[in-house]
Amino acid sequence: MRYAHGEFIVTRCGDAVVTQAYGPWNKECVKSFANEYRFNAEALFGKEWCNIVCVTGESLLIPDAELQLRERTAAMHPLGLTHIAVVLSDSTAKATTKAQLKRTYKGLNVEFTFVELIENAVEWLVGHGFNIDLESISLHVAKVASK
């Protein structure tokens, strides 16, 4: 059995599922992440919701993990996922991460953007009509800071 490589913290913040991703990730990590993500997103199924993905360190996906993340993201769109904001400020591999995630999200009918700060992500998503719980965002950021 292979072990998960990579870590994450997932928090629901209003209409957003916020993920702090520490990479690189392998497919076992993506599988574990998908289970945790689904648990947090289930209350949003049937209405439109969004993601904020904050990446830290070598935020890379090995090829089979990239494919699996694409499949998992595609499965969320019919359930209501419509927008993804990726926060790159703490990534040490920004260009590669951006290229990988563009491939991952391309053609999935999910609008996505890349920003530097979580505040920029919140602003972009609020501008698209999402209700982002700022208190939950603060708690998520505090949880990340204490890791």
Predicted feature descriptions by range:
Residues 1-147:
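Amphipathic, Lys/Arg-enriched alpha-helical "gate/interface" segment within cytosolic domains
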